[in-house]
Swiss-Prot record:
Cellular component aspect of the GO annotation: cytoplasm
Lineage: Bacteria, Pseudomonadati, Pseudomonadota, Betaproteobacteria, Burkholderiales
Residues the record lists as binding substrate: T156, K182, T193, E279, N403, S408
The protein's name: Arginine biosynthesis bifunctional protein ArgJ
Pathway named in the protein's UniProt entry: Amino-acid biosynthesis; L-arginine biosynthesis; L-ornithine and N-acetyl-L-glutamate from L-glutamate and N(2)-acetyl-L-ornithine (cyclic): step 1/1; Amino-acid biosynthesis; L-arginine biosynthesis; N(2)-acetyl-L-ornithine from L-glutamate: step 1/4
EC number: 2.3.1.35, 2.3.1.1
Enzyme class: transferase
Taxonomy, superkingdom: Bacteria
Keyword field: Acyltransferase, Amino-acid biosynthesis, Arginine biosynthesis, Autocatalytic cleavage, Cytoplasm, Multifunctional enzyme, Transferase
Chain's role: Catalyzes two activities which are involved in the cyclic version of arginine biosynthesis: the synthesis of N-acetylglutamate from glutamate and acetyl-CoA as the acetyl donor, and of ornithine by transacetylation between N(2)-acetylornithine and glutamate.
Annotated site location: Involved in the stabilization of negative charge on the oxyanion by the formation of the oxyanion hole: T119, G120
Record's catalysed reaction(s): N(2)-acetyl-L-ornithine + L-glutamate = N-acetyl-L-glutamate + L-ornithine; L-glutamate + acetyl-CoA = N-acetyl-L-glutamate + CoA + H(+)
Family as reported in the entry's similarity comment: Belongs to the ArgJ family.
Signal sequence range: none
Length: 408
């Protein structure tokens, strides 16, 4: 069961002027499920993205990078689930481009104005006949208020759709943002089997939009982990249609800061939804490391704790075996760390003080916190002013079962 994750309600998801979303049941891997999504984007919109750092990146990621760099103006996105089109060689690359060609032909745009995305099983070729047959019905039911159905159509091992909206006032105009995400396993973005899409009706210059998507990714999708694996297909895309009339043409000033905060907070909500729905997750842990020399070492330590199977299983068992956290801090790779200055809290419970057990710590207090569904682990390094936060989940028996049964 997801951790404190209510189902999104269609009425709470706001249309974004200039964006229409349509889905189809193409039977790419399983019958009778939404598995193709087409997103139509108004002419004149700007689009920016960040993608997986996995060197074995999937064919659609390569095509996305090419088409974004082409500067023709993106007019459509196409996403399929059930097949990652990764590890598929030249045939997979040709299939990704053929998908763009087919959608472009039906929409009357150029092929390099389409961004393709895939998620699912690696090392299998796309069933192109089924995928291409799904494009026309997806286009036919494209509507501005299809955000919930869109979220459903990009799910793989997710147990529920992930979608959210925001509005923000910029220069006296109401700016709307809506987004969807998917992912439940192989999540340690940089990115990881994670897709995220946010659209806004602000008018944003392309370089500014790229700065926005990069900042939002660093503070959201690149700050979560479920199992430490980095996928071949991760993508996070930001669309700005300009339909609200609120214009942002430089990466500073109050208007930029307001939109950056809105985009980042929405991305954080979508990213945390992924962790809350992590495969087999029963708890959400916030790992906050402070007092570091720089953000990089804080994040390095936070990820060491978040990735530790011993830490994650202790949280699953509600077992306050908290020396495991200190051990992870110690092997994180910060060679000049003075462990005698390290302090550790679970929520408001001070567990370790100056590198050792806090004399006032009682295990029953740690046990009380460990039984909660949401827990904050705070680690103070005592060597600077930098900080970083990572979100993760526990590791349960169900994680093994879900992944063992994934292809069956």
């Amino acid at each position: 069961m997801p951790v404190n994750l209510p189902l999104p309600q269609a009425d709470n998801l706001k249309p974004v002027a200039g964006v229409e979303l349509g889905w189809a049941e193409a039977g790419i891997r399983k019958a009778n499920r939404k598995d193709v999504l087409v997103v139509r984007v108004a002419e004149g919109s700007t689009v920016a993205g960040v993608f997986t750092r996995n060197r074995f990146c999937a064919a659609p990621v390569q095509v996305c990078r090419e088409n974004l760099a082409g500067g023709k103006g993106i007019r459509a996105l196409v996403i399929n689930t059930g097949n990652a089109n990764a590890g598929t060689g030249e045939t997979g690359l040709a299939n990704a481009r053929a998908t763009c060609d087919a959608l472009a032909g039906q929409l009357g745009i150029a092929a390099n104005q389409v961004l393709p995305f895939s998620t699912g099983v690696i090392l299998e070729q796309l069933p192109m006949d089924r995928l291409l047959a799904g494009l026309a019905p997806a286009i036919a039911n494209a509507k501005a208020d299809n955000w919930l159905a869109a979220a459903e159509s990009i799910m793989t091992t997710d147990t529920q759709p992930k979608a959210a909206s925001r509005t923000v006032q910029i220069d006296g105009k109401t700016v709307t943002l809506s987004g969807i995400s998917k992912g439940a396993g192989m999540i340690r973005p940089n990115m990881a089997t994670m897709l995220g899409f946010i659209a806004t009706d602000a008018a944003v210059a392309q370089p500014v939009l790229q700065a926005l998507v990069s900042h939002a990714a660093d503070h959201s999708f690149n700050s979560i982990t479920i199992d430490g694996d980095t996928s071949t297909n991760d993508s996070f895309v930001l669309i700005a249609t300009g339909k609200s009339g609120a214009a942002i043409d430089r990466a500073d000033g109050p208007a930029f800061e307001a939109l950056r905060e809105a985009v980042t907070s929405l991305a954080q909500e979508l990213a945390q939804m992924i962790v809350r729905d992590g495969e087999g997750a029963t708890k959400l842990m916030t790992i906050r490391v402070e007092g570091g020399k720089d953000v990089a070492e804080c994040r390095q330590i936070a990820y060491a704790v978040a990735h530790s199977p011993l830490v994650k299983t202790a949280f699953y068992a509600s077992d306050p075996n908290l020396g495991r956290i200190l051990a992870a801090v110690g092997y994180a790779g910060v060679d000049d760390l003075d462990v005698d200055r390290v302090n550790l809290w679970l929520d408001d419970v001070w567990v370790a003080r100056d590198g050792g057990r806090n004399p006032e710590y009682r295990e029953e207090d740690g046990q009380r916190v460990m039984k909660q569904a949401e827990i904050t682990v705070r680690i103070a390094l005592g060597r600077g002013n930098a900080e970083a936060t990572v979100w993760t989940c526990d590791l349960s028996h169900d994680y093994v079962s879900i992944n063992a049964d994934y292809r069956s």
